Regions:
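Glycine-/charge-enriched secondary-structure boundary and capping motifs
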Residues: 5-17, 21-23, 34-40, 178-180, ...
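N-terminal amphipathic, basic-rich helices that act as targeting or association modules
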Residues: 6-82
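Non-catalytic terminal/interface segments that mediate subunit docking, oligomerization
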Residues: 47, 51, 60-110, 114-120, ...
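Short, hydrophobic beta-strand segments that form beta-sheet elements in well-ordered domains
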Residues: 49-52, 165, 187, 678-681, ...
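Mobile "lid/hinge" segments at catalytic clefts and subdomain interfaces of large enzymes
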Residues: 76-340, 348-353, 357, 372, ...
């Protein structure tokens, strides 16, 4: 075969692996020759969208990444913030969207496993998981199948490994029918001095692979699944979905934490997307060193695996560490006690090259800089659409429906109904840190006392894809402020944010516009709040022949509060408490709302602008009042508007309320917009909020009464709110 023919064959192979012609030619230039099969496989993963962020990296540089509480920022396995008493909270959110759309149970389960490893890879013990989920309408059999599988997978992994699932969100919209979203967030706790980074260090030090054997599961996950659109052949991609074993991960977790306590590790990295290819390249790049890896030493689960398969396998429950040679015996002793496999598979070298050996034979030799830093970054070509690209939702409620019928319809809609049938599948109190559980408060609250700390932390995760589809900038501003509002409701000050940007194909102008405007909205709002991004994830190409998903930036925020016992609940807790409406003066509107969806209205091409500075000041006031101890109830007015928030507060503990609103119009009681809260407590605590709080009524009775609008018994409200349970029958 001629050299030209060989080049054509290799180029065809590169295309099949997701590389374009320009990228392949650039690889040849950086290598000084054509890559062989092993090298091409590694490059195809390291230069995939999932690993290289080639359509989003330039945008991400606009986000603020510095703050007074920040200990570890973007670029590490997870970010970390200080919470005082020498303690750190590490946290991150990541997506497992495409695998979950192909095989929902394993896709979601391994998504949880992966985010857990990210957290203990920096030396933190995982203490909580949250999830943000999106599916098509539940009238679809496929959506019910995906929901059931994903929720079961999350519960299986989290419950088995002993980490509580303390919060989350789930929404059902048509554009997620083919591309569900499964975003998992984890936070962990560590002493500040135990945090460890992933940079390989010390020429001559050993590279040790710990954990499960390596198999063929997950091969191509980063390129085949995570960096391309789904199509009708997605069932054929099931072999690229990883298989998880939470019990293996539990042993691995405890083993790694003990090794860190002993000071045995120089660096630690989990094996996630792209397996050994990514983990080793990133460790070498951050440490400015090289690595030699002998794939013949890697423990295998299957016979006759080729070197390239070993390098790109995404088998789960594996970690890579660097240790000094004299620490090997100690590591093997600890791993033996935890029944964790540990094999020295290579060493740190001087040259900044990743060499792959199969015994004595060198089967791959690549410059680390080319793998990690030289992937081309593409400029987006954004263009705002002249008309809405998403179809109007199906009408299920006539626009002539009165307030009584409208509230019941909203509460029974799958987007607003009680999530109890879902979160009851999760253990939310294991580890005995959880003080505020799902539907107990607007944010989860976990005490620090078991770890020797003072006070508590709060965490929330939020997204609002339909609102972002209406207006990518303002919708994202609302998502960030909503997350901060949830923390304010329990008296927590935000310390840091992690994000997951779920979008369609960035090569399409309208998706590029959505992505660019969304990042701009997030950056501007975070600077206004003074909150840094500690890390995150970008998931692109979430679309199919039906079109793109709603643009869905998901944000997770961690905050600190001085006393967990004082954290207000979202529901009314005592008869005779005064009820007040706290408002930042933001106009509540119906376009883009849950009510507009039920009415089958077209999505608007814009939302009212939000003054983030005004809302920030409101959040400061609410946070201060929540910490004072006099407010028993603080509930953010979000989806469905004020009437839904009042109904939720009534249903939490079966206490009614009688209120009189300054504006009883449908727009005012069902419209949406950030910056409003329902609060309840003793008169002095409510009045302490000053002019921001307008007393609107009292708690008591067995119904919700809104003067001039109507009344609803708690029985009929609860029956409507239980609609999601009926959907599972």
């Amino acid at each position: 075969m001629s050299a030209g023919a060989a080049s054509v064959d290799r180029l065809a192979e590169a295309r099949a692996l997701g590389l374009n012609d320009f990228e392949y030619e650039l690889i040849v230039e950086k290598m000084g020759r054509e890559p062989n099969g092993v090298e091409l496989a590694v490059f195809s993963l390291m230069w995939s969208e999932h690993c290289a962020y080639k359509h989003s990296k330039k945008l991400l540089g606009r986000l603020p990444t510095e703050g007074p509480h920040l200990l570890m920022g973007p670029g590490e396995n997870a970010g970390a913030v200080t919470v005082g008493s020498g303690l750190a909270i590490a946290f991150k959110v990541e997506s497992h969207n495409h695998p979950s759309a192909v095989e929902p149970f394993q896709g979601a389960a391994t998504g949880v496993g992966g985010i857990l490893r990210d957290v203990f890879a920096v030396g933190a013990r995982p203490i909580a998981v949250l999830d943000s989920l999106r599916f098509g309408e539940l009238s679809s059999g496929r959506s019910r199948y995906l929901l059931d599988g994903a929720v079961s997978g999350i519960g299986h992994y989290g419950n088995s490994i002993g980490v509580p699932t303390v919060g989350g969100e789930v929404y059902f919209e048509g554009p997620y029918e083919q591309n569900c979203l499964v975003n998992a967030m984890c936070l962990g706790i560590a002493r500040e001095d135990r945090l460890i980074r992933s940079a390989a260090a010390g020429v001559g030090n050993l590279l040790v692979l710990m954990g499960a054997r390596t198999g063929r599961d997950g091969i191509g996950g980063a390129s085949v699944l995570a960096s391309a659109e789904l199509d009708s052949e997605d069932a054929s991609k099931r072999p690229t979905v990883q298989i998880g074993d939470p019990f293996e991960e539990k042993r691995l977790l405890e083993c790694c934490l003990e090794l860190l306590d002993r000071g045995a590790l120089r660096s630690l990295q989990d094996l996630g997307a792209a397996g050994l290819s990514s983990s080793s390249s990133e460790m070498a790049s951050k440490g400015e060193v090289g690595l030699d890896i002998d794939v013949s030493r890697v423990p295998l689960r299957e016979d006759d695996m080729e070197p390239f398969e070993i390098m790109v396998s995404e088998s789960q429950e594996r970690m890579l560490c660097v240790i000094e040679p004299h620490k090997l015996a100690e590591l093997e002793e600890v791993c033996g006690r935890w029944e964790v496999r540990a094999t020295a598979i290579g060493e740190v070298t001087e040259g900044r090259r990743l060499r792959v050996l199969d015994g004595d034979e060198v089967v791959g030799d690549m410059p680390v800089d080319a793998l990690v830093d030289d992937c081309p970054l593409y400029d987006l070509e954004p263009a705002a659409p002249s008309e809405q690209i998403y179809p109007a939702p199906a009408r299920v409620l006539d626009s002539s429906a009165d307030a009584h019928e409208t509230l019941l319809a909203l509460l029974s809609s799958h987007n607003l109904a009680s999530r109890r049938p879902l979160f009851e599948q999760y253990d939310s109190i294991v580890q005995s840190r959880t003080v505020r559980r799902p539907e107990d408060a607007d944010a989860a609250v976990l005490q620090l006392a078991p770890d020797g700390g003072d006070g508590a932390i709060a965490v929330s995760i939020d997204g609002n894809g339909r609102r972002v589809a209406c207006d990518p900038y303002t919708g994202t501003v609302e998502a960030v402020l909503e997350c901060a509002a949830n923390l304010a409701c329990v008296g927590a000050e935000p310390l840091g944010l992690t994000n997951c940007l779920n979008f369609g194909n960035p090569e399409k102008p309208h998706v590029a516009w959505q992505l660019e405007r969304s990042v701009a909205g997030m950056a501007d709002t975070l600077r206004e709040l003074g909150v840094p991004v500690v890390g995150g994830n970008v998931s692109l190409y979430n679309e199919s022949g039906d079109g793109p998903i709603y643009p869905t930036p998901v944000v997770g925020m961690v905050g600190a509060l001085p006393d967990a016992a004082l954290a207000p609940r979202s529901g009314f807790v005592s008869d005779s408490h005064l009820v007040a409406l706290v408002s930042a003066g933001v106009e509540a509107t119906l376009p883009g709302s849950e009510l507009a969806k039920l009415r089958g209205d077209e999505l608007p091409l814009g939302l009212p602008a939000v003054n983030a500075a005004v809302v920030r000041d409101m959040l400061d006031a609410v946070r201060s009042a929540a910490r004072g101890g006099g407010l028993a109830t603080v509930h953010d007015v979000a989806e469905g508007g004020l009437a839904v928030a009042l109904a939720e507060s009534c249903l939490a503990r079966g206490l009614g309320a009688s209120v009189s609103l300054p504006d009883p119009s449908l727009d005012a009681i069902f419209g949406e917009g950030v910056g409003r809260f329902v609060v309840a407590g003793e008169r002095a605590a409510v009045e302490a909020l000053g002019e921001r709080a307008a007393v609107i009524g009292t708690v008591g009775g067995d119904s919700l009464e809104i003067e001039g609008v109507g009344g609803w018994t708690l029985l009929e409200l609860r029956e409507a709110w239980s609609a999601l349970a009926e959907a599972f029958v």
